[in-house]
Amino acid sequence: MRLLLFFFFHLLIFLILITSYSYAEDKWNFEKLDGFNYGALAGEVTHGDKLRFIMRKDHCDTVQHVVTFYTYQKPTDISQLNGQKIPVQINDVSGFKIKAFMVRPFLMGYQVWFSLGSWPVDTLASALKELDRYEIKIVDGHGFKAKKYFDITFNNWELDDVGNAFQRIKSNCIELSEPKEKSIS
């Protein structure tokens, strides 16, 4: 009986550990597209808002940090956000601006793509490993009213397993960068 209880207890711990690892891994989405590859996390507030880390073929030491926000708001001048620096708070710290680089119709509203810059992979990965969650809030700024363009002005992303995710993105980039062998017919 004692042996059975011991075995059951260890099996239970093993299953809990495997499930939590697989849950963190399932949160990440990895893709390769036309010379680029990325890892993405869905938002906790608006699932369609993605936090993306993009690497370009042959540039596997640099990562582009990108976020998308979806909005139902449809002001006639929403396309003027393209190219603008928008004020945000990141993890409750004010004073940041992120650049909108694409505004496109999406579903019943618009999707706005923002760049948070390009970073050395190891630098950004190390910084993000220190955090449990990454939160962005679009805020009012000089001549900019967040609620005019965004019905939901904030989102956050759980950074579970971010270190392993960055390793996978980099491995995918290196694989994408390797020359393909051509067969001679």
Where are these regions (language model features)?
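A generic "folded-domain core" signal
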Residues: 23-185
